[in-house]
């Protein structure tokens, strides 16, 4: 398995990367950790003419914390988050998610931005950051725009990124004291993709329940619908076995949140 021929560009700055992407247009792909894009290249699922490598750019590895949000550059790795080298929410919420992504070798190279751009329906960050009401920051030669994840994820393996645009950061709102968060997934063995997964945020009057690994975009339930009954209704069209597994995961996190 070998990829189709391509040109590999290594821009010196983020501005240069954006210019390169604009010039190449739809024939370009961004290369960060390569943990998802690499296999797709080898299988020739994607055949870009140009790859723009960005994981060496300091502008995409930035980490910032304010009273309102934690902002992580797109090239911050899962391993850095799992090791506590970034700010976190609550009692290590983000570190616990990063620590169960695939295997250590993947966590060492894989990035939070790359995971979101790959938009796998069973990706941990896709589900968790939707529950946490995160915002992605996108940049192109036309400027910068910000987008909530439900708007960014337009389908399985599909995002709202346009040609020449790059995801530069993700901003995660801080949570008030007393906020509750739960996350669980069902895998055949550790490190594999989940067959069922759900994340829950309860912060004051806010309730957000996200169900993933459905083969589509995540299901987001809010308010009173962020409940077992709401999940039952939302998953009514699933195969009976898949629905049972998904509802088991949802029931688990709801029970843990109430404990």
What does each of the following model-derived ranges do?
Residues 1-259:
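C-terminal structural segment of proteins
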